[in-house]
Design a protein with these regions (language model features):
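Short, membrane-interfacial amphipathic segments enriched in basic
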Residues: 1-8, 45-53, 133-137
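Structural signal for alpha-helical transmembrane segments and their membrane-water exit/capping regions
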Residues: 1-2, 35-45, 80-82
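Hydrophobic alpha-helical elements at and bordering transmembrane segments
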Residues: 10, 14, 18, 56, ...
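Transmembrane alpha-helix signature in integral membrane proteins
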Residues: 10-41
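Loop-to-helix entry region at the N-terminal start of transmembrane alpha-helices
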Residues: 12, 16-20, 65, 69-104
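Cytoplasmic-entry segments and transmembrane alpha-helices of multi-pass inner-membrane transporters
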Residues: 38-75, 97, 107-111, 115
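Membrane-cytosol interface at the C-terminal ends of specific transmembrane alpha-helices
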Residues: 51, 89-138
């Protein structure tokens, strides 16, 4: 049933899956965390409201999240080839996986930060806290 070649193929498949998942998750958080913070800050109830920036980021996230992954995979093939050098394989799959994960992470960060009570943020502002301090510590 499971000969040596089959076990090696399964081990390679497990390694490739872990590699793609971990690397794309890392880059998804690297992109999604600042995206979520920017969404929270520029919201109309945020610390630095900016309707134009918020709308642009919001539209990008909503559009990216609504595109099925297979279509996203095909649509970003030229970008993948530009960044990785080829459009197939486990390393090339990281690009569309990251682009699919980042908006999800950004939206989760935004919703988590919006749960911070407004009174706590107002208290920090009244004590002279800067925006960066509020984002990091409050």
């Amino acid at each position: 049933m499971l000969d040596k070649a089959m076990i090696e193929m399964m081990a390679q498949g497990i390694w490739d899956t872990c590699y793609m998942t971990l690397v794309s998750t890392f880059f998804g958080y690297v992109i999604g965390l600042p995206l979520g913070i920017a969404l929270t800050l520029t919201d109309e109830n945020g610390i630095t409201p900016n309707r134009a920036i918020y709308r642009v980021l919001d539209i990008i996230i909503n559009v990216t999240r609504s595109v099925p992954f297979l279509i996203l995979l095909i649509a970003v093939m030229p970008l993948t080839k530009l960044l990785v050098g080829k459009s197939y394989g486990s390393t090339a799959t990281i690009v569309p996986l990251t682009l699919a994960a980042a908006p999800l992470v950004g939206r989760m960060v935004e919703s988590s930060l919006k749960e911070v009570p407004a009174g706590v943020i107002e208290a920090a502002l009244s004590m002279g806290a800067k925006t960066g301090t509020i984002v990091r510590k409050v």
